[in-house]
Amino acid sequence: MQKAVIIYSTTDGQTKRICEFLKQKLEDKINIDLFSIEDIDRAELNFYDKIVIGASIRYGKHSPKLYKFIEKNIDVLKAKFTAFFTVNVVARKEGKNTPDTNPYMKKFLQLTNWQPNLLGVFA
């Protein structure tokens, strides 16, 4: 059975709750673990076939820890099947609720050298 990991960067806990929900929905289909972005290291990432990262917005920005994590692990992320989602209140607005139209997603993709296989936005 394939192994996946969900990694979250959260400020107030909403992103963690979303990730816990995703894990619960997927765990009967795939071996899946859940970690805070601070609690997983590069060596552990290599054990997973699929990597999902969820991150919240605080004062208009993703956490610097998110960008450092991606920069540090970019070669692993590029070699795996990956997904990324962002959690922000702007995503509740029509015209800003898709990965292609959400300003925070667009900015994130411009600032990183990572192009995940799947993208999502949640409000």
Regions found by a protein language model. Give the residues of each.
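FMN-binding flavodoxin-like domain, especially the glycine-rich phosphate-binding loop
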Residues: Q2-A4, R17, K25, K29-F35, ...
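Conserved N-terminal substructure of TIR/SEFIR domains
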Residues: I6-Y8
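Residues in the short beta-alpha loop(s) of Rossmann-like NAD(P)-binding domains
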Residues: T10, E38, N88
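Glycine-rich NAD(P) Rossmann-fold beta1-alpha1 loop
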Residues: T10-R17
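Flexible, glycine-rich phosphate/dinucleotide-binding loops
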Residues: G13, D41, A91-K93
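Short amphipathic alpha-helix with an adjacent loop that forms part of the alpha/beta core around
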Residues: D41-F47
